[in-house]
Amino acid sequence: MNMSTNQGRTTGQSLPNGMLEDNYPRNMWWVAARGDEVGEKPLARWLLEKPVVLYRLKDGTPVALDDRCPHRWAPLSAGRVVDDLLICPYHGIEFGSDGRCTRIPTQDTIPDSMRVRSYPLVESGAFVWIWMGDPEKIPACDPPVDMSYTADPNWSVVLGYYEVAVNWVLIRENVLDLTHIAYLHSKTFKQDDWASVPEVSMDGDTVTYRQDFDLGPLSPLFCHAMGFSEAKPVKREQEGRMPSLAVSFSDWNVHDPEAQPGVRADFLMRGCHIVTPSQRGKTHYFWGAAFDIPNISTELCERTRASVTEAFDEDKALLEQLYAQVSMDPCGVDYPEIGRLGDTAGVRVRQVLQRKLAAEDRSLSG
């Protein structure tokens, strides 16, 4: 891909036209759901433009199948689970967790073709990961990202979810570009020192960034959960990491220079941003704000949730406006994207994406 982050240079033609197409790798792990969403009652979810049904067996094992009965294509998610069997709501045809049909009420014989595809799942912390690509390629690919900290009692974790009417890449780039915080989030984050360019590096397909900040107040989104007032000056370091196109982390390392002897002075807030393509022009966005402080009160957690939601509502509104405009008028080369120095992390994302798609003999078009 021909892209540059130099000022005045175009960022390449993989987007915006590419954001209107099927531009996600299939041979990788994506997050299907939060673990607490998946229970004995079938859950319908579109993932990578496919209808999928998720549920749990009696022993707690999560299951994912194509959400379409092969008989008359009725959604299996509208059925029910009885004794670990998923029963189609239309004619009562039953399926096991491997997708094989186990019973057709009107006959004794079961054709081999009466089956649905099952998908490998891995549960890590608060999230369930799904593989929807070629199963034979699983051993050669990176495993799901470890999210075990989201279920660690030594952390207090706040989770949230959006369905956003945009291509998934827009969200992935947004959460790695923190230079927009001083502008788009001026009323919520209330920090104007984000406009400077972070230091970005790359190791294989992992994109990282780092930025140090002068002494100043912590954002009201997170200060209360850490026990600070909105005016309390602290020292903070920002470290971000994208180990997978599906997830990125944003670590806020906070130091209180005025902490009294014997009083804790260092804290960590870890943001996680998980994106999974849903349908064309729709994306599942799971977010998390985790503090390395056990047993933060429910009141403070809910206050954090409300504040973060208010800020992310601002992202959602702008990105959906952007995507709607590009969808109606995909200008392509007539209006190429013009890069700036703050785009480095986003450009690295596109480079990783291009390599993943090329490995599947696909590419982004412009």
Specify the residue positions occupied by each region the protein language model found:
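Rieske [2Fe-2S] iron-sulfur-binding domain
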Residues: 2-18, 24, 29-156, 366
